[in-house]
Every structure is written in C-alpha cells, then in structure tokens.
C-alpha cells in the first residue's frame, strides 16, 4: 500500500510538472509578444510604465514556476561557496547597497549549484529590499556549511518569523516580504535548504535588522 501511494504521488508530481511546462511556455509567449509590441511604440512615460509591469509579470511567473517545480531535477556537484557568496556581494552592490562577505573553512561543498545559489540569492535580495547594508558570512566545518545573511533593516518580530516562510503571506509591519516581490522568495529558499537536508532559521541580527541562517550538512 505504501509503495502504491508513493507511485501515485510521483505520478501526480510528474503530471503537475508537465502541465506547468506547457502553461509556462504559453505565458512566456504572450509576455514576449507584449514586449515586442511595446518596443514598436517608442519611448514615453506611459510605455515605460507598461514595460515595467510586463517585466514584473515575467519575474512573478518565473518565481511561481520555480516554487511549484522545486529543484529536485538538478544534479549535485562540488561548488565553490566562497566564490558564490562573492558573486552575491557584487550583485548586491550593483543594485546600490553596501555589502560585505567573509568565508571561513574549506570553500568547496557538494550541493545542487543553481538551486543553492537561488536559495542564497533569495535571502540576500530579501535583506537588500529592506536595508542599506547586507553582510554575508559563510563557515564550513567537518559536518556543516553555515551561511548567515545579516542586514540593518527593520527586522521581523519573533512571533512572525516562521510565518514569513508561508507562500504569499503579507506581513502587517514595516518588513512586508511581498513588498516589491512575489511573496515566494523565503518559501523557495527554505524548500531548497530542506531538500539539501538542512534548514533556514531567522533571528535578530547584531546589525539591528534580520539574520537569516542557512545550515546544510556537507
């Protein structure tokens, strides 16, 4: 009975993934057509506003699909985590935020590279959305890889920290994770961390804002 249930679940996931692939292709086609038509209209404040909306819709579509699809199809590979954190620091500074990075211990860890980068990028972009400075720190020992993302933003009250991992949740305070985003970033990040055998926790940062900690076995 357990084996039959497992087969049914796997079949349902496969059907869902196939359906999502078809839907995503159709929606991407429509959005691409919008972009081409807008490009023919020339430059004006109205056209630029519509272009921004279309870009936002495209980003939301990709986030929804990433959440529904998961990351289990990617193969694990040795990955330079220190180099990955440096890439995230540069991306953060390109968007106008101050950022620091530090890594301690052996830098190579076997993870699913694209998925793990998405996990960390979601945490860093969430921090940057509400703060002016983001500090990224990695540490690897013989058992665990730990990455912390600290910021100087408004933080999240202790009683709400688990709630922000729920998809599409809107907080009622200054740090609304859906502000300028899809409301899926932290949910996707935690799913990826857990699929690596680890987890993400949130706490108060010594910088005054939020500390997000990713911990996965090595």
PLM features: what roles do these ranges have?
Residues 180, 185, 189:
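Short alpha-helical Gxxx[C/S/T] motif in the catalytic ATP-binding
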Residues 70-74, 108-111:
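Conserved micro-motifs of the catalytic ATP-binding
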Residues 133-143:
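Short beta-strand/loop element within the Bergerat-fold HATPase_c
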Residues 98-110, 142, 207:
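Conserved catalytic submotifs in the C-terminal HATPase_c
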Residues 197-198:
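Conserved glycine-rich
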Residues 156-169:
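Short conserved segment of the HATPase_c
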Residues 7-52:
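Membrane-proximal coiled-coil signaling linkers
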